[in-house]
Amino acid sequence: MKHTPFIAQHRAAGAKLVDFAGWEMPIHYTGVVDEYHTVRCKAGLFDVSHMGRIVVTGAGAESFLQRMTTNDLAALRPMQAQYSMVCNEQGGIKDDIFVYRLTRAGEFLLCVNASNRDKIVSWLTEHGRGVPDCQICDRSAEIAQIALQGSAARGIVAAIGLSQLDQLKIRESTTVQVADAECLAARTGYTGEFGYEFYVYGSADSVWDKLLNTGKSFGLKPAGLGARDLLRLEMGYLLYGSDIDERTTPIEAGAEWAVRFEKGEFVGRQALLIQKQAGLSRRFVGFELLEKSVPRHGFKILSASSPQSLIGEVTSGNLSPLLQKGIGLGYVSPEYAELGTDLFIDIRGKTIPAKVVKPPFYRRPSK
């Protein structure tokens, strides 16, 4: 298995390590729910270096990426990021990504999912052949990635001399020095909490140690992928391989807001327009259980009026520690997608009542 620069720190902290997309990664340290509450109430430090980081540069980079992604890069200012998708010709989602416009003209950083890194590098390289002045470079091995998430993040970065990060608005970024490493610090994350992600261009372990040691007095703890998944589920954030894949489209997945048809041609545009005009055969919804139980990926969604009728499938589900009820995401036939619609979830042969709700299931308190 592959390892991030922080494997020694994970082992020293007693992490339970698992295989995730070919990487040996911490699923938890002290426990998934404990780490979840730490992030919701204080702050957690996540190793997300297993994700892919692709740099696209050159005078032709912007027009190339406009054709390869669904969102509109023209809307991005320097040092700003946007959520976007890479689609195939049929409109299926090859990956959901973050695109950062960096300071120099024609320089972009793409953050892609770990399981899709090789696929996206190959896809971009294939489509980039013959594009004038456009270089595609997989820099995943050179750039580490750390997420500092939670309300205490603001105080932690101030304590290490980075109070200027407080000026960043959501999805903005800037370059900073942490320990002895240059970093791109961004107001981004996958938890729904206030926080930052650090793209580390130098000695990555020194950045991890600096953040963790400084943050201890603020209640900071390392957090694993288990807590990260719970946190993103409560926000209704999509998980590639569970909620979306190449058999689903952005429109079906409720992510049409990340598709800008008006910008012009991009891969998958025509197929998505046809689907939009023809109507959907399924819609992505959130739901909450009305009785105590836990929904899981792959469970069947049934009609409340006719419990023998299969109307959809759960793609993500768990017990929300905050709400103390089962919550989930999934696809249902369009006529069952209205808010408040009653459903049944088949949980190991038992039909558990549920209702359609609009994610996020959790909203961070405004301060």
Can you describe what each PLM-predicted range is?
Residues 85-88, 186:
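Short beta-strand segments that buttress and anchor functional surface loops
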Residues 1-27, 101-367:
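Conserved, structured C-terminal
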Residues 1-84, 92-94:
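Acidic, proline/glycine-enriched N-terminal capping motif
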